[in-house]
Amino acid sequence: MLIKITQGAPYGVATGADGALWFTLTEPGAIGRLVPGEEPVVHRLDPADGGPTVIAPGPDGAMWFTEFRGNRVGRITPDSEVTSYEADSPYGIVAGPDGAMWYASMRSDRIGRIAADGRRAEFTLPVVGGMPSGIAAGDDGALWFTLNQAGTVGRITVDGETTLHPLPTEGAAPVHITAGPDGALWFAEIGAGQIGRVTPEGKITEYPLPDRACRPHAIITGPDGALWYTAWATSRLGRITTGGAIRELDLPGAEPHGLTTGPDGAIWVALESGALARVTP
């Protein structure tokens, strides 16, 4: 099923505590909300030049999102009240185990933290030009992140202690990362056309995809216990089991980016061609 979004091109999508799907529209600078079965509602941001990208639910019942171009992290409540916080080039964002929101700062080689009261802290990573991109909360109580240009997956504790795990494949360019159902972290290697897995101890496994030029982008754990990913260049939705079995589905639209498990148990995908796609696992 395809839901057209006439107001812009969806980029990130996540499910909120209110049982709705929330999505970002990088252009024209807006946040959308969709209750399955109803019409989408779009809230234009002010200012609208920030380029909202990744969105995630917070522990406070609000949705938090990054504005990469605007150097802001935003918070929007179910009744569309928006608060913004200064942050340098934020991209990935996730709720941490400490009740704060954590984000990856692409241009400054930092991982940032925003508390519920707006207090912000940043931790400088031991790498220059690494381009922190995706971030996820691991089952081990730490945050895990990708360094796109450094070809590395990292781990940071809530106290800021960092460990880096370089990837075996040169030019892997990892982007999004998620906690898997097996206690490991899974990530998309957009440069190598692979899905990667790293254990809490740092053991890395890489799974080549059927089309190595597919540009895998986002990845989540689905309701069926498998990992689901978007293949941006081939307009496909992929599924990989924890044992490495892969299958892919053609999507009824182009340029898939973010994805989430919806309140209805389906996989919802943000398509930059101007739609949200619904796929039954």
Language-model features: locations:
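Surface loop/turn motifs at the tips and blade-to-blade linkers of beta-strand repeat domains
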Residues: 2-7, 44-48, 84-88, 124-128, ...
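Conserved beta-strand positions in repeat-built beta-propeller and related beta-rich domains
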Residues: 23-27, 63-69, 101-107, 143-149, ...
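Short loop/turn segments that connect beta-strands within beta-propeller blades
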Residues: 34-38, 76-80, 114-119, 156-161, ...
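Beta-rich catalytic cores
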Residues: 9, 51, 69, 89, ...
